[in-house]
Amino acid sequence: MFVILNGSFGIGKTTVASLLARAIPGAAIYDPEQVGFVLRRLPAWMLGLARRPPDYQDLAIWRRLIAQGARRKHRHASVVIVPMAFTNPDYLDGFAQALGATAPVHLLCLVAPLDAVRARLTERANKEGREITEFEFRRSQECVEAHRAPNFGIPIDATREPAEIVADIQEKLRL
């Protein structure tokens, strides 16, 4: 089984994914951002591009690699939890379809008001001794606005404590 844990940048996907993985025997986390971080370091010409798009999610190679990686992870884990901030419904749908040939896919989307997401981002930045970045500020707004649409997964209220969110997910998925 795959659990795609979509949600805004800074909404708590990583925290919820970690708690969920600990709560489900045989579960593991697969983080597509790691693939994006690697691709971001490569020069555009290595990716066959004249210039790099601003978002690595726009790279077709990223979308292919994350599906391959998640399927490989599934060989070693009964449940693969995938935390990722998808804002393009076509990319999310393509990813879910690629995984669906391997195992059942559950799409969940952590949702919260923009002010709650930005408060979390500010708190995180303060703990790290820095200011919230322009990227974090802009990306949080893009995500919150996009995730109001119904095609990003079953909405999960992320204004609650992480343990409550995990319990809700387990109940919804009967885990």
Question: What are the functions of these language-model segments?
Answer:
Residues 5:
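Hydrophobic anchor at the beta1->P-loop junction of P-loop NTPases
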Residues 8:
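P-loop (Walker A) phosphate-binding loop of NTP-binding proteins
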Residues 11:
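ATP-binding Walker
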Residues 14:
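Walker A/P-loop
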Residues 18-66:
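Conserved substrate/cofactor phosphate-moiety recognition/catalytic segment
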Residues 57-103:
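Glycine-rich phosphate-binding loop used to anchor ATP phosphates in small-molecule kinases
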Residues 101-121:
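Conserved phosphate-donor/acceptor-positioning beta-strand/loop module used by diverse small-molecule
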Residues 126-168, 175:
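Small-molecule kinase domains that catalyze NTP-dependent phosphoryl transfer to phosphate-bearing small molecules
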